[in-house]
C-alpha cells in the first residue's frame, strides 16, 4: 500500500534518515505490476509507476503524497485518463487538472480523450508547464525525452487502457517488465 510506504518514508525522514537512503530502501520494495512500482532507469531517472487502475480517490491520494516528496531533480507528472467515469468524466478530469496544477510539479504530461477537461483544470490553477493530447504522440514523446534528465523523479498514473507504461519504456528502465 503506497500510503503506508509514504508514511514509513516520512517517519524515516523525520527521524533523520537521508532521502537517498530512503529512496534506495523503497526501490527494494516490490509490488504487483502497475501498482506503485519504483523503477530505476539507465539514465538515472527515478520513476513511480501506477498504471494498473485510476479513479478520483486513487489519483487524489497518490498525487498529494507524491507532491510532498523531496527529490534531487525535478518532479514530473505523467497522468493518463481515468476511464469509465461515465457522465462525470468531464467534471472529474477538470477537477484532476485543478489538483495536479495546484501541486508542485515542474512539468505535467496528460494523455487521454479528456485532455481538454484536464487542461481546463490546469488553467484554473494557473499552471503553465504542461503538454496534453489524446495519446502519446511523436511530438509529446520528443518533448518528454528532451525534458527528463538524470536525478528527475517521474510519477506516472493512469487507467490500464491508456497504456502509460509507454512513458516508462522511454526512460530505459532497468528493473522492469513492460509486458502486462
Labelled PLM ranges:
Residues 7-180:
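ATP-dependent carboxylate-amine ligase
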Residues 1:
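Active-site cofactor/substrate anionic-group-binding motifs, chiefly glycine-
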Amino acid at each position: 500500500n503506497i500510503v503506508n510506504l509514504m508514511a514509513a518514508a516520512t517517519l524515516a525522514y523525520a527521524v533523520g534518515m537521508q532521502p537517498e537512503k530512503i529512496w534506495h530502501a523503497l526501490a527494494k520494495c516490490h509490488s504487483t505490476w502497475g501498482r506503485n512500482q519504483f523503477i530505476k532507469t539507465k539514465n538515472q531517472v527515478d520513476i513511480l509507476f501506477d498504471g494498473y487502475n485510476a479513479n478520483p480517490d486513487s489519483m487524489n491520494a497518490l498525487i498529494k503524497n507524491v507532491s510532498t516528496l523531496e527529490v534531487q531533480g525535478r518532479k514530473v507528472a505523467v497522468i493518463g485518463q481515468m476511464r469509465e467515469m461515465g457522465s462525470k468524466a468531464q467534471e472529474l478530469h477538470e477537477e484532476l487538472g485543478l489538483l495536479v496544477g495546484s501541486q508542485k510539479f515542474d512539468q505535467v504530461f496528460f494523455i487521454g480523450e479528456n485532455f481538454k477537461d484536464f487542461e481546463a483544470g490546469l488553467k484554473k490553477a494557473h499552471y503553465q508547464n504542461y503538454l496534453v493530447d489524446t495519446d502519446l504522440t511523436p511530438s509529446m514523446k520528443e518533448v518528454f525525452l528532451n525534458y527528463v534528465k538524470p536525478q528527475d523523479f517521474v510519477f506516472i498514473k493512469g487507467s490500464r487502457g491508456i497504456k502509460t507504461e509507454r512513458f516508462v519504456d522511454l526512460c530505459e528502465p532497468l528493473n522492469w517488465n513492460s509486458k502486462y
